[in-house]
Amino acid sequence: MEYKKTLNMPKSGFPMRAGLPKREPEMLRYWQELDLYNELLKKNEGKPLFSLHDGPPFSNGALHMGHALNKALKDFINRSYAMRGYYTPYIPGWDNHGMPIESAIIKQNKLNHKAMSVADFRTACHQFADHYIDVQREGFKRMGVVADWEHPYKTMDPGFEAREVRVFGQMYKNGHIYKGLKPVYWCPHDETALAEAEIEYQDDPCTTVYVKFPMNDDLGKLSHLDKSKLSFVIWTTTIWTLPGNLAIALHPDESYAVVKAPNGELYIMAEALTEKVMGIGGFDSYEIVETHPGSFYENMLASHPFLPKTSRLVLADYVTMDSGTGCVHTAPGFGADDYQTCLRYGMDMVVPVDDQGRHTDYAGKYAGMKTEESNPVILQDMKEAGSLFASQEIVHSYPHCWRCKKPIIFRATPQWFCSVESFKDDAIAACEDVRWVPSWGKDRLRSMVLERTDWCISRQRRWGLPIPVFYCKDCGKPICTDETIDAIANIFEKKGSNAWFEMEAEDMLPEGFTCPHCGKSAGFEKETDTLDGWFDSGSTHYAAMERDQGFWPATMYIEGLDQYRGWFQSSLLVAVGALGRGAPFKECLTHGWTVDGQGRAMHKSLGNGMDPAEIFNKYGADLLRLWAGSSDYHVDVRCSDDIFKQLSQNYLKFRNTAKFCLDNLTGFDPEQLVAAADMQELDRWAVTRLNSLIRRVFDSYDAYEFHAVSHAINDFCEVDLSSFYFDIIKDRLYCDGEHSASRRSAQTALFLILDAMTRMFAPILAFTCEEIWLAMPHRQADDGRSVLFNCMVQPYEDYALPEDAMDRWARIAAVRSAVNGALEQARADKTIGKSLEAEVDVTVPAEDAFLADMDADTLADLLIVSQVRVTVGDALSVTVAPAQGVKCARCWKVLTSVGTVAGHDTLCPRCAAVVKALPVVE
């Protein structure tokens, strides 16, 4: 008889090979037909709310790994909350306005944008943004992200723009917005102001110079010195700013020395820096003639080194003694401190550089030169004029535009500002009510808000939300009132913000409108600047979330580390400054950057980038999700082909674990689970280990430690199941009677394990866990349509073994490990072949004496040998010998009892009984 047919062989039909790139699109179609997102909301309607507000990615390109990491984490969070009984609406969004899109369409389409009408140019930008929204949306959907993809929010949508206009109006009304001439970050390449969040620092080589400013008017205080030889020495790393110099700042309380050099020249510098500066100047010896506090020199005049003008000596507490000369070059058109200092002294603002970064006529012979072009020319002129004290080549950290990557300048221009100082304390206080993950996020954002200057919110761009301000042609004053804001918002709601560029000011204002300042109605002009894109995204919690979903604040914001100075901060400032509320989020979570396998940033120039679309096609989206779910995202997350190959192995461990369970649950009815009292202790051990896993996973989801979830499940599959439990129960599953109590006991444990693991891993391995769920048997209370419609299970406490029993099983596992080692050696020595050919003699120490009392057949099954004898001795030892008896033709155990049942000469009694009970097939 062929006994293989009498075995309960695995037969679920669940494939071992995942084939994710082919199978996942089929699952996406299933979810679409199921209307997964809306069905999930219906399922959890009325339950506690968890609202994750989507930080909007910029719609200017295809997905990259940073997008993928961010959206994967968001999906893990939403799914895990949904499966713990929360109502989880999730509206994805996109940030649409700004310079990156302008630059991209000009470059790609070779547009002469300056020859186009503003409305036509903006229409082209709108179409570009819409295209990449579609591209990114399809990528996110391919990842399996559950969201309301048909109704996203867009910062360029008319409804959003109208709400943002009202945000601006309220902030203006609160007195937090003003227009002024102040130095701001300026990109000459893109000809626009930048916010702090739009700059990044790079190390650049530069020439740093020490420059002599000859004494012009000493106010009679230094008449005893030869004024023709007397100079102040300043230091700067930006040579091009020297034409804009109006003053030299000294610290009022620091000591300044008049230093005589061997060449007879007299130099004024901070006494504390004299040795260092004179050394840089090449002087081995010098004499300090006299010293005075910085305040002594106030209001003296020095001559500019190469322009026909003077520089005033002023005092400033910010002057430090850690670098330079203690005499600080002060150009109010190029620095915030410089500006404030000169303002305090009543000096006029001078900005000798235009929008394109070229010197104006004020700079004399350097007019028309770009700042970087003028550096070597000015340097050479100073050398020839004898005004250069010294120069050095250094590398310093310099700000660059985050979009065009070119160096920027600090330049005073008329701009609109948000006065953060007036509500800074409230914004800082609001941080106290937020849960920060990681916890240091609170201090990071608090310190950034504390140290920040006023927020420059205007941009000299065309693709953006127009600043909703009119100007009176009579008095020239800006106009922003409740009446004008309502009028603009209503027009934008119907026509979009292009109306600003298509309609006359008078047509946008209410009939009979008069200037609130002068009462005239002769005419009005519109502001030409647009709002900073960070004002757009900072308004999303009001303009999109509260409008579309009706709740505020969000439960959570989650974005990359750079958003402390970006979206987190702008959202907080808008919420506090405009709405008078607290933080727009209850929890704030951050993740690191995506880098290559060596920890380097991914760039096209390095050729080290990875494309999510290629990963979908090669490995499948679940592997990308597993990458995100296995990584400690609090630090930079590495990705490479080698990493994905390793993840493929981890994935297969889980898939094969699920397949083993499914294969052996064929015909099993979960409504007839074996009661704990009737289960074999080994099976209860497995469920008790599962309970520990459930608790770890719940704690990890609560802490948003998804890598801990993945690692815990992987370890459980590999250590507890594959290497221990599954090996032991195979004989019972395959060889015991199909409906026997022993087999049903194991199947009960397998069902509980598979059911719990599938639910727990579903937030991360969305496609695979859904595939398992659709293939496995279910209880009547479960929703078989999708694993996502079911809650994660709580520990099965009724099945749990007591602690002393678990301690015994830990000792059994240790003995089994020792037996396995001895079996391996016996195989190597050709003493045995397979482990079932072995008989083992085990000596155990006194603390393991319970093993000697165990049923020998049960212990042999645990050790996967045919025969075992246990004696108590001093230490653990194992001896292996060939088993005595005959090999059973069905289960392959070697037993002396084989053939003792009449009519079954080749079977052991267990197998003979099972075969006898089988129905006779004619």
What is each PLM-predicted segment?
Residues 95, 184, 188, 194-202, ...:
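Acidic, turn-prone loop/beta-hairpin segments
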Residues 191, 460, 476, 519, ...:
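Cys/His-coordinated zinc-binding microdomains
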Residues 247, 254-327, 336-340:
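Protease-associated
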Residues 187, 401, 472, 515-518, ...:
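Short cysteine-rich clusters marking metal-coordination/redox-active sites
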Residues 345-357, 461-463, 485-636:
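Alpha-helical recognition segments enriched in aromatics with Gly/Pro capping
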Residues 42-103, 164, 234-242, 314-341, ...:
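N-terminal catalytic cores of NTP/NDP-binding nucleotidyl/phosphoryl-transfer enzymes
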Residues 2-20, 26, 30-34, 106-243, ...:
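Residue patterns forming the tRNA-binding/recognition surfaces of aminoacyl-tRNA synthetases
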Residues 184, 398, 467-469, 512, ...:
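Residues immediately within or flanking Cys/His clusters that coordinate Zn2+
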